[in-house]
Design a protein with these regions (language model features):
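Hydrophobic transmembrane-helix bundles of small-molecule transporters
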Residues: 146-278
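Acidic-residue sensor for enzyme active/binding pockets
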Residues: 57, 99, 174, 205, ...
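Transmembrane-helix bundle of Major Facilitator Superfamily
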Residues: 1-171, 323-327, 333-334, 338, ...
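Hydrophobic alpha-helical interface/terminus motif in multipass membrane transporters
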Residues: 20-23, 110, 144, 172, ...
Length: 363
């Protein structure tokens, strides 16, 4: 049931990309509005992920997951019924917030529910769902857009969300961080949210609006960026980095004082945590980066349809679904370090091979 919630989050991050041309035609969107339909989801998701995860640890992870499912389903319905770009962007904002509620809740519930070998298998399934559904998203979006309407790319979340809500209610046990300190880290929340929004915005929009000198006008609704000689990306990035540095200093000071923190940076003192996150980041950059670029190349350069593009990406989903449980089995037998090393090597070979093949096809 939790896998269904994770699946909705990941699918919605990728399904819209192949539906955007149809959305632009149907709602008569400007290119700027279309860009915000995809961007706002990632911005809100990144901004609230840490904070909402901490709230779930304190108030109840199952409760947060159920609330996130409700928000996500309602916002999906609003997105599907949106009569104009403004309401669609607002619905996508709510979707990002709902996703930020669900993802940390599912991860914490898995960690609290399973032990030993079962935990490794559960995390393997959790990871395979993320990797697999990231590839299924374009296929599902292409089929729904081609066979029905782009609105069904959002409506599909309604039955899935209802089934997930019923399953979580019936089968998932409530859990909390019993050893957590009481209170809420407001300074940490503000600095982390501002920092993540600023940095993520800059990374997403830097190539579009220019990092320093503006290459196009930045607008939100009727509001226009007032500085003609400076892109909004540079100030956003500077504010984001400054806020994240402040977040680090605030969290370290609060931790030393014995006060509640949003994130314990002392965890990076553990080699397994530090290098595990580094490995996960490298894998995500490779897989998710390819999932963003490859559909654009297939459709814009090779002339593939949205559905055919999804079919090309389907083997990635199959491999991800099979790889999660298999990796858990091999990790128990040979040790996680060898499995991670082998997996990263396979991914490097695969991505390099795809790059060579695409260059030959393009020639």
């Amino acid at each position: 049931m939790m896998a269904l919630g994770v699946a909705m989050i990941i699918v919605d991050a990728t399904i819209v990309n192949v539906a955007i041309p149809s959305i632009i035609r149907d709602l008569n969107l400007s290119l700027i509005d279309a860009e915000w339909v995809t961007t706002i989801y990632s911005l809100v998701f990144a901004a609230f992920l840490i904070t909402l995860g901490r709230i779930g640890d304190a108030s109840g992870r199952k409760r947060l997951l159920l609330a996130g499912l409700v928000v996500f389903v309602i916002s999906s319905m609003l997105a599907g019924r949106a009569p104009n770009g403004g309401l669609l962007i607002g619905a996508r904002l709510l979707q990002g917030f709902g996703g930020a509620m669900m993802l940390p809740a599912t991860l914490s519930i898995v960690n609290a529910t399973f032990r030993g070998r079962e935990r490794a298998i559960a995390f393997g399934i959790w990871g395979s769902v993320i990797g697999g559904m990231a590839a299924v998203g374009p296929l599902l979006g292409g089929w729904l857009t081609t066979a029905h309407s782009w609105r069904w790319a959002f409506y599909i979340n309604l039955p899935i969300g209802i089934v997930a809500f019923a399953g979580v209610t019936a089968f998932v046990t409530e859990s909390r961080d019993e050893h957590g300190r009481p209170g809420f880290d407001l300074p940490g929340f503000l600095t982390s949210s501002i920092g993540l929004v600023g940095v993520v915005f800059a990374l997403i929009e830097g190539s579009r609006y220019g990092w320093v000198e503006p290459t196009r006008l930045f607008t939100i609704g009727s509001w226009e960026w007032p500085l003609a000689s400076l892109s909004p990306v540079a100030p956003a990035f500077a504010v984001g980095v400054t806020s994240l540095i402040a977040f680090y200093m605030i969290e370290r000071r609060r931790s030393h004082a014995g006060r509640v923190v949003l994130f314990d940076f002392g965890l990076f003192g553990l080699g397994s945590f530090r290098y595990g996150n580094l490995a996960a980041s490298i894998v995500s950059l490779g897989e998710l980066g390819m999932l963003f670029i490859l559909p654009l190349f297939l459709q814009a350069v090779l002339g593939y349809s949205a559905f055919r593009t999804g079919v090309v990406l389907l083997p990635l989903a199959i491999g991800a679904f099979m790889g999660g449980p298999t990796a858990a089995h091999f990790a128990n037998r040979y040790g996680p370090r060898r499995v991670v090393t082998a997996g990263m090597g396979l991914e490097a070979i695969a991505i390099a091979s795809i790059g060579v093949l695409l260059s030959l096809i393009h020639i």
